[in-house]
UniProtKB/Swiss-Prot annotation:
It comes from Bacteroides thetaiotaomicron (strain ATCC 29148 / DSM 2079 / JCM 5827 / CCUG 10774 / NCTC 10582 / VPI-5482 / E50). The gene is purH. This is Bifunctional purine biosynthesis protein PurH. Pfam families: AICARFT_IMPCHas, MGS. GO terms for molecular function: IMP cyclohydrolase activity; phosphoribosylaminoimidazolecarboxamide formyltransferase activity. GO terms for cellular component: cytosol.
């Protein structure tokens, strides 16, 4: 197996021609002959260098509006021929197929076309067929052929040519083949993701959409994000988004999307520590902050309303990591941008995946995202006393928060304001006690408040504790074998309870 290979013939067919001129010039100086198609051939000839048309080699014209140009045995035979196999050499000589030693390809910009909002017909036309086939063929035969599969690889090729002329080592060819397969796998993943639109049970990513983060969950851990944050947000101020920021941003987006009313939420470690629905952003912020002004320090803020100057002046009084809104007025941005590192995001309209993935052990868990949002129609009153219209509003309000809180979770709310929550507890009773203690520590009166639970009550103990604190209405999934005991206690003490039939565990 020969280490060094000389480049005698290069097939060049690219979309992006910026940076190609230096390569073509150097190759010509090294005596390399060119083979190309359409626009690329015209580009090479415009530089003053001869270039043979693919059609002249194949004796077959480009057909179907350019859909079929290079897909021909005289092209692929020249790429895939194994130079150390006598049988291959005999066949290409018999059919007068020239050996192709270098393939330079740059694929149609499929992702950019999708991002531009183009029609499906235009998007389909940007699915490269010949180019991806050339990449795979040349990469497969890296023992004899060097492949440049994207504009990003123009410089490595030029550096190689400048270092030792039109020759390549096996190590260089193998490295370029690896990069080529990274390009082809990413390209196919992008096409799959377009057609799948988040429906599939497989998560596909590649190094092409990898973003290295400052670190992972802790400084001693490396961290990466695979995806396209630019499709979801415009970052208009602040430092680089961290691994932990992304976790909280994800939780914040999931939570705020539950609400149609103007709402402001404050999150810390993926859980809401403040949330309120109000007529204005300023009012919503003020009451959300009142829920837990201590935990709000260093949190992630999100609203579904436009942040104005009045709201920004109040928000600016505390330290926080990230703020997300659909828009900000000019004065608000000037105020919020006073802190250099503060991350300010404008949220865009973007389709989110319907599947969730979690790596564990030696595999990956996949599940449907919990997209169920209970409404009045889903509530079943299981007590003699029905909740009042105001209590129903609060129950649904609280249920959305508990759905997005770590289990076991209890949420206490009143007047469309989060009073307190107990989250991530091994006991539902402990979660309730935590919520009660927290609400009292910030001066909230629990009389007339409602309680939401992410799962059923195995015993009546939680409603007994809630009753003693003045809580008057409860929402829970139901389904315990001892539901009747819980319902009976509520009836005896004049409490209203509704069940939804939907559990919202979150681990």
């Amino acid at each position: 197996m020969s280490e060094s290979k000389r480049i005698k013939t290069a097939l060049v067919s690219v979309y992006h021609k910026e940076g190609l001129d230096e390569i073509i010039t150097k190759l010509y100086e090294e005596g390399v002959e060119f083979l190309s198609t359409g626009g690329t051939r015209q580009f090479i000839e415009s530089l003053g260098y001869p270039c043979k048309a693919v059609e002249d080699l194949t004796t077959y014209p480009s057909i179907l509006g350019g859909r079929v140009k290079t897909l021909h045995p005289k092209i692929f035979g020249g790429i895939l021929c194994r130079r150390d196999l006598e049988q291959d050499i005999q066949q290409i000589e018999k059919y007068e197929i020239p050996e192709i030693d270098l393939v330079i390809v740059d694929l149609y910009p499929f992702e950019a076309t999708v991002a531009s909002g183009a029609s499906e017909a235009d998007i389909i036309e940007k699915i490269d067929i010949g180019g991806i086939s050339l990449i795979r063929a040349a990469a497969k035969n890296y023992n004899d052929v060097i492949i440049v599969a994207s504009q990003a690889q123009y410089k490595p090729l030029l550096d190689m040519l400048m270092e030792h002329g039109a020759t390549s080592s096996l190590e260089e060819r193998r490295w370029m083949a690896k990069e080529a397969f990274a390009v082809s796998s990413h390209y196919d993943s992008a096409i799959f993701n377009y057609f799948d639109a988040g429906e599939g049970s497989a998560f596909r990513c590649s190094v092409n959409n990898q973003k290295q983060l400052r670190y992972g969950e802790n400084p001693h851990q490396k961290g990466y994000f695979y995806g396209n944050l630019d499709a979801m947000f415009d970052q208009i101020h602040g430092k680089e988004i961290s691994y932990n920021n992304l976790l909280d941003i994800n939780a914040a987006v999931d939570l705020i999307d539950e609400y149609e009313d103007l709402t402001f939420a404050i999150l810390k470690h993926n859980n809401a520590c403040g949330l309120a629905s109000r007529p204005t952003v300023l009012e919503a912020w003020t009451d959300a902050l009142a829920g837990d002004p201590v935990s709000a320090f260093g949190g992630v803020l999100i609203t579904n309303g436009v942040i104005d100057k009045a709201a920004a002046e109040e928000i600016n009084k505390i330290f926080f990591e990230v703020i997300i809104a659909p828009d900000y007025d000019v004065d608000a941005l000037e105020i919020l941008g006073q802190k250099k590192n503060r991350i300010i995001l404008v949220r865009k309209e973007a389709k989110l995946p319907k599947k969730q993935f979690r790596a564990l052990l030696n595999g990956v868990l996949v599940q449907d995202k919990d997209m169920n949002i209970e409404t009045v129609a889903d509530l079943r009153t299981v007590t003699d006393k029905a909740p009042t219209p105001e209590e129903v509003e609060d129950l649904l309000f609280a249920n959305k928060i508990v759905k997005n809180s770590k289990s076991n979770a209890i949420v206490l709310a009143k007047g469309k304001q989060l009073l307190a929550s107990g989250v991530g507890q091994t006991s539902r009773v402990d979660a309730l006690k935590q919520a009660i203690e927290k609400a009292k520590s910030f001066g909230f009166d629990l009389n007339g408040a409602v309680m939401a639970s992410d799962a059923f009550f195995p015993f009546p103990d939680c409603v007994e504790i809630a009753d003693k604190e003045g809580i008057t209405a409860v929402i829970q999934p139901g389904g315990s074998v001892k539901d009747d005991l819980t319902f009976a206690y509520c009836n005896e003490h004049g409490m209203a309870m509704v069940t939804t039939g939907i559990r919202h565990f979150k681990h």
